[in-house]
């Protein structure tokens, strides 16, 4: 027996990363998992080095970021790698979720993998919001004010929760300090859930583009798919480097280069681009409490897909109607992202409300109805074939 199999620790690594049998038909959409792991490593490593030079005191936070940029050797690279790493993390995560929606990765027996993935998604959004506030630029201050104020929509105890979160009567020094503490902690919680995600995936193995269970036509992870992953890793690093070195502020907001000022309200308060679709849903509902419920519901509704999808065939590879509505959903999601950065004025308000209805209808109406129709067509076609 080889040493990698006889050693208790190396055997665990071997079963997950070397000899793990993978479907031979998986394509490059299955490489997003390794890219997300790379993004998480980049974020944790750059975040640790940034924390060495950052001060969470509200009087020093903005200056500390400028100190990192100007005085720390290589500080500009660490800061830009961390900021753009967050954007690339969400790019990969949205594509990964889209792949899961298209190929039915949420279907049994991989429902647990999907549910843990949704938890990782929520935690990543929380970490991104907390980190955005730590810069304490103008948009950071007002973004923190708006988002934390959402808890005031909770009946009876909402205002008390907001004051408790702030540590005072407005976003102040205790707020930024506790946000930084949680921002440092959450990535390690995400890493723990990533391990759980990996363990749940290892139980039944990866799905495949065909949507069928094939335990015979498989190849070992190392030698085949490790090399395949490396191709997309280098492509990712190429585009990541383009942004870090040549256009580091493209995915940021210019107002965040102004120190946070509670006396001056920006013309438009918007979060980072990767939170815009859900921000648009929040703004599309006139009632504050219902808007908050809609925003959080838009994220957690991913958990209902294993229940609402009634199709007997996993994935959309061979389903024409499901393909059409899936791409309609993607276009609608992109539209929500654009509407999230627009001013609250006609016609954007009505467009946001229509896009919000379509978003929820996809999960609660379109998927179950279309999957049922396709089931009927499948059984009729199979009966006629006999």
UniProtKB/Swiss-Prot annotation:
Cofactor or coenzyme needed: heme b
GO terms (BP aspect): mitochondrial electron transport, ubiquinol to cytochrome c
Residues bound to a ubiquinone: 202
Annotated cofactor note: Binds 2 heme b groups non-covalently.
Membrane topology: Multi-pass membrane protein
A molecular-function term among this protein's GO annotations: ubiquinol-cytochrome-c reductase activity
SUPFAM superfamilies recorded: a domain/subunit of cytochrome bc1 complex (Ubiquinol-cytochrome c reductase) (SSF81648), Transmembrane di-heme cytochromes (SSF81342)
Extra facts: Heme 1 (or BL or b562) is low-potential and absorbs at about 562 nm, and heme 2 (or BH or b566) is high-potential and absorbs at about 566 nm.
Assembly mode: Fungal cytochrome b-c1 complex contains 10 subunits; 3 respiratory subunits, 2 core proteins and 5 low-molecular weight proteins. Cytochrome b-c1 complex is a homodimer.
Protein name as it appears in the record: Cytochrome b
Source organism of this protein record: Kluyveromyces lactis (strain ATCC 8585 / CBS 2359 / DSM 70799 / NBRC 1267 / NRRL Y-1140 / WM37)
Source organism phylogeny: Eukaryota, Fungi, Dikarya, Ascomycota, Saccharomycotina
């Amino acid at each position: 027996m080889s040493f990698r199999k006889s050693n208790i620790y190396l055997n665990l690594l071997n079963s997950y990363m070397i000899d793990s049998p993978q479907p031979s038909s998986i394509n490059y959409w299955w490489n997003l998992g390794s890219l997300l792991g790379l993004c998480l490593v980049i974020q944790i490593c750059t975040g640790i080095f940034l924390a060495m030079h950052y001060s969470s005191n509200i009087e020093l936070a903005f200056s500390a970021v400028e100190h990192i940029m100007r005085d720390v050797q290589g500080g500009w690279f660490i800061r830009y790698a961390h900021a753009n790493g967050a954007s690339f993390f969400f790019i990969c995560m949205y594509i990964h979720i889209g792949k899961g929606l298209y190929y039915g990765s949420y279907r049994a027996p991989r429902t647990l993998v999907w549910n843990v993935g949704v938890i990782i998604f929520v935690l990543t959004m929380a970490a991104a919001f907390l980190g955005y506030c730590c810069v304490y630029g103008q948009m950071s201050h007002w973004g923190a004010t708006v988002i934390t104020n959402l808890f005031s929509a909770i009946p009876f105890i909402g205002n008390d929760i907001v004051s408790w979160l702030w540590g005072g009567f407005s976003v102040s020094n205790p707020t930024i300090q506790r946000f930084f503490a949680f921002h440092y902690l959450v990535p390690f919680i995400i890493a723990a859930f990533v391990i759980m995600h990996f363990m749940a995936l290892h139980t039944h193995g990866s799905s495949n583009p065909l949507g069928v269970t094939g335990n015979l036509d498989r190849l070992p992870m190392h030698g085949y798919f490790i090399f395949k992953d490396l191709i997309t890793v280098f492509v990712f690093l190429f585009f990541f480097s383009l942004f870090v070195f040549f256009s580091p502020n493209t995915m940021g907001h210019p107002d965040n280069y102004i120190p946070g000022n509670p006396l001056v309200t920006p013309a438009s308060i918007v979060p980072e681009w990767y939170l815009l679709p859900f921000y648009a849903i929040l703004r599309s509902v006139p009632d504050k409490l219902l808007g908050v419920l809609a925003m959080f519901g838009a994220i957690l509704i991913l958990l209902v897909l294993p229940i609402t999808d009634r199709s007997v065939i996993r994935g959309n590879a061979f389903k024409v109607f499901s393909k059409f509505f899936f791409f309609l959903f993607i276009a609608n999601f992109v539209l929500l992202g654009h509407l999230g950065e627009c001013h609250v004025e006609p016609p954007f308000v009505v467009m946001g409300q229509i896009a919000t209805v379509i978003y929820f209808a996809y999960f609660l109406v379109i998927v179950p109805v279309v999957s049922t129709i396709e089931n009927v067509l499948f059984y009729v076609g199979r009966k006629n074939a006999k």
